[in-house]
Regions:
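Start-transfer (signal-anchor) and selected internal transmembrane alpha helices
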Residues: 1-23, 214-216
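Extracytosolic helix-loop segments that constitute the early lumenal/periplasmic catalytic or substrate-binding loops
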Residues: 20-26, 37-64, 68, 72-83
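Membrane-interface alpha helices of multi-pass inner-membrane proteins
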Residues: 22, 26, 135-141, 157-161, ...
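Short acidic/glycine- and proline-prone juxtamembrane loop motifs at membrane-interface regions
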Residues: 33-35, 139-149
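Transmembrane-helix motifs of polytopic, lipid-linked glycan transferases
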Residues: 93-119, 156
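Transmembrane and membrane-interface helices of multi-pass
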Residues: 101, 114, 122-136
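Specific aromatic-rich, kink-prone transmembrane helix
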Residues: 105-112, 130, 136-137, 149-175
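Membrane-lumen/periplasm interface segments of specific transmembrane helices
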Residues: 180, 185, 190-280, 293-297
Length: 297
């Protein structure tokens, strides 16, 4: 079986991965988490005039939600609206298709890093297979969630940052990271760790970090303008997120868990015993290859 897989061409692997993603866009229904619908799709529904502001959740009224993802869906579906397409189920599929296509493209683009990390072609293939053919990968990629969009943008930005040499490429990486941040604020942390890796382990030229930081700032500026489009007034959603969750204490209602709880979730929600292998290999990699960029990503 392993020999047969090693003989499969990259083209067939790409087509197989694309097929699984398209399959997932059609057979996925509903939402994985309430936020995926009520804080993205319903915000979009407001712009289309299908719902009133009073019907939206408290996150809208407290202005803690960035509008970047909703803005993308709005303009990408505008031509269909002009053509008279009104079926909400079609739009649900369409947004899954767009998000899934971006996620698939990000993992395909990840081959640039795999080829620099592994010189043997069969190892490159197995890296691609793990990224694309684990049962949860296509499902996660097609979700219209902030997690899915932000991870795809983050991968594009990180791959450009780690593989390109031109200064403009670092600026583009920063733009993608800035939009990653506007898709999901928490993604600022992995971006910071890529910077730490570049600064302390690779000892890259500080100018490259500055160019990427400028890209982040420009993207944040665009994101702030998009929030104005969404809320109808100037608003800095990150501040409101911090204010409501950490000063006013709304976050307390969602429960607390220690960091190591993610390990337990990974084991029990990732379908044992395969999840035990995945978690074990990940922890082993962090310990044995702590200087590798993948550890810092």
């Amino acid at each position: 079986l392993i020999a047969a897989i090693n003989n499969i061409s990259f083209k067939k692997l790409l087509l197989g991965s694309l097929f699984l993603h398209l399959w997932a866009t059609y057979f996925s229904t509903g939402f994985q988490h309430f936020d995926e619908h009520f804080q993205i799709i319903e915000f979009l529904n407001l712009k289309w005039g299908g719902i009133k502001e009073a019907q939206l959740p408290w996150e809208y009224h407290d202005k803690i939600r960035p509008w970047f993802q909703t803005f993308l869906y709005y303009w990408l579906s505008a031509p269909l609206k002009l053509l008279g397409v009104e079926n909400p189920f079609f739009y649900s599929w369409y947004y899954r298709f767009l998000t899934g296509l971006l996620g698939w493209s990000a993992t395909v683009y990840f081959m640039n890093l795999l080829k620099s990390w592994f010189k043997e072609e069969h190892l490159q293939k197995w890296g691609f297979i793990i990224l694309n053919f684990l049962w949860f990968a296509p499902f996660v990629h097609v979700r219209t969630s902030s997690e899915s969009l932000s991870i795809s943008l983050y991968l594009f930005g990180t791959i450009i940052f780690l593989t390109k040499k031109e200064m403009r490429s670092f600026f583009i990486a920063g733009l993608l990271w800035g939009f990653t941040y506007h898709a999901r604020f928490q993604m600022a942390l992995p971006v910071a760790f890529v910077w730490f890796y570049a600064l302390f382990l690779e000892q890259r030229n500080l100018g490259r970090l500055i160019y990427s930081a400028l890209g982040v700032l420009v993207a944040i500026g665009f994101g702030t303008a998009i929030d104005f489009w969404g809320y109808g007034e100037w608003s800095f959603s990150l501040w409101h997120y911090y204010r409501t969750n950490f000063i006013e204490g709304r976050l307390a209602g969602s429960g607390h868990a220690p960091v190591w709880e993610y390990v337990r979730w990974g084991v029990f929600r990732g379908i044992p015993p395969l999840s035990l292998v995945l978690v074990g290999i990940t922890v082993w990699g962090w310990v044995k290859m702590w200087r590798h960029p993948l550890t810092w990503m």
